Amino acid sequence: MVYITYNTPETVRQITFEELMLGVDIPLDSLRSGGHGSTRTVVCSKVPERIMKITYLDAMISQLKMFNTCYKDLIDYPNKWELYDHFEIPKKTGGKMRPIDAPHPELKKALAQLKDMMSGWMFADHHTCAFAYVNGRSTKDAVIKHQRFRSWYFCHFDFHGFFPSTTLRFVLKQMEEIYPFNLILEDPIGRRELRRALSLAFLNNGLPQGTPFSPFITNVMMIPFDHKFARLLNEFQSGKCNPDGTPITDRICYTRYADDIHISCRVFFNYRKVERELIAMLHELDAPFTLNTEKTHFGTRAGRNWMLGLMLNKDGDITVGYRNHKILKSTIETYFKDRRNGKKWDEEDLQKFRGNISYYLSVEPATIAGVIQKYNAKYGADLLTCISNDLKPKAA
């Protein structure tokens, strides 16, 4: 069994995989791009002949050999801990800190090269339900999927130890069913070289957070899980029945953002049964990480329905929340008053302020633009221009 994932640009959106394999007049290389992050995953007993014809296995193994030769000193470095800077940043949810292992420049370069090389071998490197670390996708895009589904009931699940618990053994096991890595692993030399190259990406037998490779490889290894779980939820039988005794099927929307899973439905559903199915699927995959059941949360749009730092409210609108609106208005007011009184803000504070404004504008463009215009009129100045001017280096 092999999972093949490809991008779905408009030209192939209505064409089945079987039609593509039968020789529809569309070059298969066109499946490597387009679709704005939307992909399709199919499961085959083996890699189809048409795909095998454009799969250059010997070249892939040669690239792995060259990579391993080029970065031999890094791969064999006795204490990889010394190749990283280690620090902590606050989690968005507040309270706890998130450990970050930032690779030194040479290692970062090597891991970025490994990511680009492996990603280039695939038609697409993520399932369509995965939204984290995907070009052209954001947290808002994940929430929009649930918004378009017109869901009312929501449940959030969280994986425990997603990055630090992921082992090289688990990644290789998953790759045995993911094209084209399954072909590389069938070759003894390919298996040896792939294992050696991947070993560079691990620290203390886990994936470090802070490298360009860890996010990529988690999306790849989760393709089988995402595919199975999405199919399960597409025809989920929660135990309810029609008057004639036939089971009621609830179609459930599913998105995954790294270790955050969100599911939603237009009608009430048995989220505890979903939780049990999720745990069973992790056991089936022999996953090294677990479900943090203490963080499972079920609710409706009528309540505080936060998703990935955004709120999908009872009216079906995506917002940054009332409290963030209030803080933004207060900060703008303070900034304009300080500027009028000649009090300068630190560069770090200005950068953070501008970043927050940019993010809020991406979430609620009309609402936030209206807030800014209100204060621009009140103080007779353009907020964003003022911030840019204050960030310009002053002449010596």
Where are these predicted regions, by residue range?
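Right-hand nucleic-acid polymerase module
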Residues: 1-91, 95-204, 208-211, 216, ...
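Short beta-strand
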Residues: 252-256
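Short beta-strand->loop micro-motif that forms the acidic, two-metal-ion catalytic signature
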Residues: 259-266
